Amino acid sequence: NTQRDLNIALINELTIIFDKLGLDTLDVLEAAATKWNFHLYKPGLVGGHCIGVDPYYLTHKAQSVGYYPDVILAGRRINSGMGQYVVDKLIRNLIARDFNVRQSKVLLLGFSFKENCPDTRNTRVIDVYQHLTSFGIEVSIYDPYVDAEVAKKHYGVSIDAELLVSKYDSIMLCVSHDQFRSEQDLLLNMLTPDGFVFDLKGLFERSDRVVRL
């Protein structure tokens, strides 16, 4: 799990660099995959009860015997900061489209820590939610897999199990549940005229209304 955490952290850091260079991360990964020994990892939020937790057991033990694990903790720091990073990028795109950030409405797609499951343990979507609401943004969450009562009890958030048709300035795909694939057209029609999808998973077809991580 520590190895997986570090591999994802590398891709997340490269994603931040590529964004500053004006490069699409998924395009770079596709090109890199033409090399026979390339190992594919994709950027995104890193949560769950394993990858985002287990490295701390190892780093705690290492420090208890007098060794500071720089690389492992650096990877954890990068992955833990992705919630803030994606919110910053979303807000930059809202501003670029002349939205009033504090009056914006955002829909988060998915709340579980991985696709097609109801498990919300250590989900980092909560980081995204909290950062967005700290800017005064009105945030809704849609996840057909997650138990709404569990989410309310453990995270204090309201989850819609069904897609409520409304208008949003941005729709952020956080978790790539299969059901979202069949709802792409409906979701795109729920955007305001200058609204956009912020696709963290590369699920939506490319268009001028889709921003990728």
Predicted features along the sequence, with ranges:
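Structural/interface elements that position substrates and couple domains in central-metabolism enzymes
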Residues: 1-213
